[in-house]
UniProtKB/Swiss-Prot annotation:
Superkingdom classification of source: Bacteria
Record key words, sorted: Antibiotic biosynthesis, Thiamine pyrophosphate, Transferase
Name of the molecule in the record: Thiamine diphosphate dependent-3-acetyloctanal synthase PigD
Gene source species: Serratia marcescens
Polar residues bias (residue ranges): 886-904
Gene (UniProt): pigD
UniProt similarity note: Belongs to the TPP enzyme family.
């Protein structure tokens, strides 16, 4: 018997029977305030700290005769070490006791004492409104107030007490979390979020219901957070006022918000975070789970009528292969999708609200151009609505006609019964591989919870020619192989968006045949200067409308004239021969360049190509490798010719440390550091290049180790690369380095807030360095150069950009270091450390001056290159002879010897 009694005792040493007798003996608190402050029921806890327990019971005459006493007990948890905090809260609840409380049970580690509340006019007005509202309610509730010093103690106490209840009817209501303990510091938002999530999860696992909404949990902190502030996910955050009147009014408002929005709202059920089904969300998750080879990307910008769909994706998509990232706007969704499709073939799902299809801007056309596979869900109005808010189906416009004009496939679903058929058609269009598919869906469709088992058909992908199938030896293929095996000494391959497997074959073929490789402004790094940590002996440089390298220019020209078509041939691999890919005019392409084009799309076959290879790239490369038969002497002459053209700067400015720095100087110094890191530490990075002079300079002058992403692709939209950086930071397997001009920076939103949001969700993906160079020269430099070098005009206001210097900032978020710093000089130590330190975002604002020198931007620079070629003709011939005499070896044998370089 003695053991049984001990087992049923609670933590204060009272068994249930004793507790019940004591509770009945307590004087009703409503009528005797002075007794409330002095009468205590309870005993000391087993620990050294004191414990207090009190039960207050309203007398019958104090309750409304028409009020229905609720058998539910609502828990109010107060986590604090501050007696004044707790006692002020008790006093406020006591002040609105009429019409609301039937029974109050208090468990506290602090003395129970009511304070004299401040007679403030605002508080009195709030109290009057609260009582007026409470008079209209037809129930009185039971409340259990639990005060603890920590969340862990509160968790244990609630679970323990709940386990002892014979008929548990306890639902957790409000949680007041005090972070203002003297001599303490506020926890970070993410730490409080994690602690609260663990608290509510523990209650849920123990079967304890809770009103778990934004009105149920409040944390009080000392001061506003700085420099980064964001919305907590599990609670509301308030700075505790030092003014007692303000503090008591805030507590009253918080309680009434909870009571009105949760307890009296029967749509809110005390069962924790309610996970509603969403038909469209589940079907899209299942589709990408079936079709995506590995990860698939989800990104959204929320709106009211798509918030349920987004909430479902947030809860369920990641566990089924999705990576959910956010950007600062809808435009960023398209940029992130394009970059990740081009570099990693990652399909995507984008979700936007009504009227936002236009916010994708020209990047939507780029997604179509690059054939990025993905689905965009956009909210739309019903066709019979009259000028609906944000709708684009009105008597004067129709978004569907816009999509038709842009040749972007879409489906419009405005009936829940048609979801199955609409998704079947959307999936069929997706498998055609012609770019993103748009689903325009009305609110009833977006919020549907109906089951669609068996109602959606996923057609099989359209069969394509497999790279494993042997290519028939067509006449054009035979001619291409003959050019490789027996063709001219100058054989150049410009690489488009080749995959890793394709480049591995290209590298082997170039090594065996002596082929020179170049990349382009649209696909920088497709032919890297360093491959697998070693200098790539086949790499010449960049060939493009802007930014063509001196080595490439010298290789293709003699005395400022293109070499004869019989002496050289240019292969353009996976290319449309777009204007951006070469500096050559239409006339030169037609009459002066022997061009071989490889593309799988017959719509891309160019009229300038002398030889068309309409076939799969990987299959072509495998066929070429199988038929390689290059004469060793020809191969050595080709190799010697490549090695003879050196990778030296073409202008003096690149060596001159002026102030402000020139772009030439900054990138020359940066390249020196990066090449040293590659060669000594195996440094590897993904480059991101925005539209502008400095993006050109970086693509041309900074060594690359792998394919990067370029904003110059397609429409060449300023800002695309910057917005894509926020996504590539989480998907790139290497460090990330972005080169963004001040023009591009100013044309799109700041990426830092969205970047921090993703840090809070995916910190495990950031074991790398992300560096963004904001290159600030105060003008739109490419236009400036056009005006000054081509039209011989002075610069004008239209090219001017205003840069406002910001103070340097360093901050840590979720164990990730962020630094923002202005660089006026090239600080090698700072840059080296930034590039090689993981878990770090570096935002460098680099102060530069404008000039028209170098980087292959203007014809004037081309003429200076020609003069340099003529002046150093003898040195070049000596270099060719030296290279031809070197013994044959592996691909690392052609590393540059700085002591033997000559200007070319």
């Amino acid at each position: 018997m003695r053991a049984a009694t001990a087992a049923c005792r609670d933590r204060r040493g009272l068994c249930r029977a004793e507790f019940a007798r004591l509770a009945e003996a307590v004087t009703p608190f409503w009528l005797h305030k002075e007794l409330i402050m002095t009468t205590l029921t309870g005993q000391a806890r087993l620990t050294n700290s004191a414990a207090y327990e009190q039960v207050w019971q309203a007398e019958r005459q104090a309750c409304r005769t028409d009020a229905d006493p609720d058998t539910l007990t609502v828990g109010v948890v107060v986590v604090t070490r501050n007696p004044a905090f707790f006692q002020t809260g008790l006093s406020v609840l006591n002040d609105i006791r009429d019409y609301v409380f039937n029974r109050v049970h208090i468990q506290s580690e602090m003395p129970l004492k009511l304070l004299d509340l401040a007679a403030d006019s605002l508080y009195l007005a709030a109290r009057e409104k609260a009582l007026h509202f409470l008079k209209g309610q037809n129930k009185a509730i039971n409340v259990r107030i639990i005060q603890c010093a920590s969340l862990a103690e509160a968790t244990g106490k609630i679970i323990y007490t709940h386990a002892l209840e014979q008929r548990p009817e306890f639902h957790l209501g409000m949680l007041f979390y005090d972070q203002t303990t003297p001599a303490g510091v506020d926890d970070s938002i993410e730490q409080i979020d994690r602690d609260l999530d663990a608290f509510y999860s523990a209650l849920q696992r123990s079967g304890i219901p809770a009103f778990y909404t934004t009105f149920s949990t409040v944390a009080f902190i000392r001061q506003l957070r700085s420099p980064f502030r964001y919305l907590p996910q599990q609670y509301r955050e308030i700075v505790r006022s030092e003014d007692p009147a303000i503090f008591q009014t805030e507590l009253l408002c918080l309680w009434m918000d909870f009571f009105e929005m949760n307890y009296t709202n029967r749509r809110v059920k005390p069962i924790g975070a309610l996970a509603l089904h969403n038909t469209l969300g589940e079907q899209l998750i299942q589709f990408f789970e079936r079709t995506a080879a590995e990860r698939w990307l989800v990104s959204y910008y929320t709106g009211s009528i798509i918030s349920n769909l987004i909430g479902y994706l947030d809860r369920h998509a990641e566990a089924r292969g999705a990576l959910i990232l956010r950007g600062p706007n809808e435009h960023a969704i398209a940029c992130g999708a394009m970059a990740n499709w081009q570099l990693y073939r990652m399909p995507f799902l984008g979700v936007v609200t009504s009227g936002m299809m236009d916010e994708f801007k020209g990047t939507l056309a780029n997604l179509k151009e690059t054939a990025a596979q993905g689905i965009i869900v956009a909210a739309e109005n019903r066709g019979n609505q009259w000028y609906s808010f944000q709708g684009t189906l009105t008597p004067t416009e129709d978004m569907r006609e816009v999509l038709i004009a842009r040749r972007i496939p879409f489906v419009y679903i405005d009936d829940v019964e048609m979801i199955g058929a609409g998704l079947t058609e959307a999936f069929r269009l997706y498998h055609q591989g012609q770019g993103p598919v748009v689903i325009l869906a009305t609110q009833n469709v977006l919020e549907s919870t109906l089951s669609l088992e068996g109602a959606v058909c996923d057609p099989s992908p359209i069969p394509v020619l497999s790279a494993d199938d042997p290519l028939p030896m067509s006449e054009s293929l035979a001619q291409a192989i003959a050019l490789i095996n027996r063709g001219p000494e100058r054989l150049v391959w410009q690489l488009g968006p080749v995959s890793d497997d394709e480049y591995a074959l290209i590298h082997d073929i170039a090594d065996a045949a002596g082929i020179a490789l170049v990349d382009s402004l649209a696909h920088p790094g497709s032919a890297p200067k360093y491959y697998q940590g070693r200098r790539n002996p086949h790499y010449l440089g960049t060939l493009a409308i802007y930014g063509y390298s001196p080595r490439v220019y010298n290789f293709l020209h003699t005395n400022d004239k293109l070499n004869a078509m019989s002496e050289q041939s240019l292969f353009m691999i996976k290319s449309r021969v777009a204007q951006i890919t070469t500096p050559f005019s239409d006339g030169r392409l037609e009459r002066k360049v022997h061009l071989v084009q490889l593309t799988h799309d017959d719509r891309h076959l160019s009229a300038y190509a002398d030889l068309h290879l309409h076939m799969n790239c990987l299959a072509f490369l495998r066929t070429v490798k199988a038929h390689l038969d290059v004469d060793p002497a020809l191969r050595e002459r080709r190799r010697a010719l490549i090695a003879a053209y050196l990778d030296s700067p073409s202008d003096v400015v690149s060596q001159l440390p002026s102030l402000p720095m020139s772009a030439n100087y900054f990138f020359c110094q940066l390249n020196r550091v990066i090449e040293e890191l590659i060669e000594t530490e195996g440094f590897d990075f993904t480059g991101v290049y925005d539209v502008g002079r400095c993006g050109i300079s970086a693509a041309r002058n900074v060594a690359k180790t792998r394919r990067g992403f370029s904003g110059w692709y397609g429409r060449a939209l300023m800002g695309d690369a910057l917005l894509a950086t926020g996504y590539l930071a989480y998907t790139s397997p290497s460090h990330v380095m972005a080169f963004i001009g001040d023009g591009a920076k100013g044309i799109v939103p700041d990426i830092l807030p969205a970047f921090i949001d993703n840090i809070l969700t995916h910190p495990q993906l950031l074991n790398k360095s992300i560096t963004v160079f904001y290159l600030c020269n105060g003008g739109l430099s490419v236009i400036n150069t056009y005006q000054e070098r081509i039209l011989f005009n002075r610069t004008s206001r239209q090219m001017r950009l205003v840069n406002v210097e910001q103070p340097d900032v360093e901050q840590t978020v979720n164990n990730f270091h962020i630094q923002s710093k202005t660089l006026t000089h090239f600080d090698e130590d700072v840059i080296r450390q930034a590039l090689t330190t993981s878990h770090r975002l570096n935002l460098f604002s680099v102060v530069l001056g404008h000039n028209n020198e170098g980087d292959g931007i203007s014809p004037g620079h081309r003429q200076r290159l020609a003069a340099l070629i003529r002046a150093d003709h003898d040195a070049l011939q000596e270099r060719k002879a030296w290279a031809a005499q070197q013994p044959e070896s592996t691909s690392t044998a052609f590393d540059q010897d700085p002591t033997q370089e000559a200007t070319s």
